[in-house]
Amino acid sequence: MASQLTDAFARKFYYLRLSITDVCNFRCTYCLPDGYKPSGVTNKGFLTVDEIRRVTRAFARLGTEKVRLTGGEPSLRRDFTDIIAAVRENDAIRQIAVTTNGYRLERDVASWRDAGLTGINVSVDSLDARQFHAITGQDKFNQVMAGIDAAFEAGFEKVKVNTVLMRDVNHHQLDTFLNWIQHRPIQLRFIELMETGEGSELFRKHHISGQVLRDELLRRGWIHQLRQRSDGPAQVFCHPDYAGEIGLIMPYEKDFCATCNRLRVSSIGKLHLCLFGEGGVNLRDLLEDDTQQQALEARISAALREKKQTHFLHQNNTGITQNLSYIGG
């Protein structure tokens, strides 16, 4: 195995977020309010199963332990189960997760688990069906809820649910969410609304700091848990009276980037060192056959030396991220 991926600030990288499509069938107000519009896809299209196999093998050899498949909506790919199986071939990768809108969860989650999936994140921004419809543009609340139940039935011991925190939309619904997870092993993750190139007006109107919820959770006796090295950026809280947990992802908090442990590869094969970084490093020309493995690993390692210490969201610099479907949020 090659040496562990480490940047100039001594941060070690165990976690790859791999986008496999930027297509999504939902029209979430904070991401794709006008629906999906094709952009950035080369004549080659999205990464193939073989290309995904090669890029994840390279990251595994460089110390990656966790791969999250993202989009867009990853389950819209007809070969999604094959993609899971291809990533699963790497023994060094201990966790394979997906972030999904839940559209196909009820139908397909059992086959995903059989292929090797170990974790699921489902996006649910409201527990009110009408508000869910208003946020996502899809009247699929009951279908998504049935999908979460199906995930438990398929054998997943815990399901993570992502909720984008928005002022005057859902920030005041904490009690409703807490009641939902009291007897369910769900880790409910409130994610601060992040500014993107296309979402500046929405951000100014609806952003609220996750610290408001953190202060309330601590007041109610919730306990902050320690992070594991391959965990994502969430601050996780537990309570003895609840089967579920609460996670808070607060990218505007001081030192948020100090514990960064993840890199991103887009659906067209570009390595992105930060969700809100500039440009990207092309890897696709080194994904054509297995003989390029060593060169691929060398390019990834060399690129990491250019990773910045922090994002520049506080300066209203959102980099190339026009919307969160582009490189998978």
Swiss-Prot record:
Q: Does the keyword Secreted apply?
A: no
- Please state the Enzyme Commission number of this protein: 4.1.99.22
Q: How is the cofactor bound?
A: Binds 2 [4Fe-4S] clusters. Binds 1 [4Fe-4S] cluster coordinated with 3 cysteines and an exchangeable S-adenosyl-L-methionine and 1 [4Fe-4S] cluster coordinated with 3 cysteines and the GTP-derived substrate.
Give GO MF terms, alphabetically.
Answer: 4 iron, 4 sulfur cluster binding; cyclic pyranopterin monophosphate synthase activity; GTP 3',8'-cyclase activity; GTP binding; metal ion binding; S-adenosyl-L-methionine binding
Cofactor(s) annotated in UniProt: [4Fe-4S] cluster
**Pathway annotation:** Cofactor biosynthesis; molybdopterin biosynthesis
What's a single GO BP term from this record? Mo-molybdopterin cofactor biosynthetic process
- Positions that bind GTP: R17, R68, T99, K160, R262, L263, R264
The entry's function note states:
Catalyzes, together with MoaC, the conversion of 5'-GTP to cyclic pyranopterin monophosphate (cPMP or molybdopterin precursor Z).
Similarity comment: family membership: Belongs to the radical SAM superfamily. MoaA family.
Q: Mind telling me what this protein is named?
A: GTP 3',8-cyclase
